[in-house]
Amino acid sequence: FCNFWDTRKEVEEWAGDYVYILAFPTAGGQMQDDHLDGVLFDHLMLEGEQKADISNYADLTDLLTSADLKWEVPHDMVEWIWIHMAINAGVTSTAARSGNLENPEELALNLMNSSSELSLVIKAIREALKVVEARGVNLKLYKAELLPYKIPAWIAGKAMKIMFAKNELTRKIMTLHNDKQDIFYCCQSVYQTGQELGVKMPILEANMKGISL
């Protein structure tokens, strides 16, 4: 239930003999003086039964159903998290390029109110997804997740601005995400891997040069 940029083999090495399953919530929030201010949707991503390798998968899904939680099973949970990280890197690096990460809420608000900046986000996400593809991920297996980023950037930017204006919970997730180290980890992980793999990413590169902690 967190962002990571590591391989499945590395995750298995961390876990050792511990029985686990990979999942990811549709959620966001922050801690202030032991108080959690957050948003939790009734939907999560869940590793498929064959790859999860746990004996009580049916019990887990029954539990989710009893709590009125819906789940979706991607082709591969690790790859899905990489894609999620890439999308985050495109969004947050664009937001942060124009200011200091000490005030991420203000940066998020400025971004959500500008269709031109959101259009740039789409282009940055496309570059970040090329990094994921360069790691060996077949993006065609994630068509549904990536469809919004195929739309012409100027149209997508306007649509995103309207979506953020109308969807209070999605907007709140953006403004509550204030862990600057997590934000920087996400951006830096994707960017460094792109450099190592020789991926051309001029927008991400310009964004990263503008970020200050």
Segments from the language model and where they lie:
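Internal alpha-helical scaffold of NAD(P)-dependent oxidoreductase catalytic cores
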Residues: 14-19, 37-139
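Rossmann-like NAD(P)(H) cofactor-binding subdomain of soluble oxidoreductases
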Residues: 1-35
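NAD(P)-dependent Rossmann-like dehydrogenase/reductase catalytic/cofactor-binding core
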Residues: 122-213
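Exposed alpha-helical structural elements
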Residues: 10, 59, 81, 116, ...
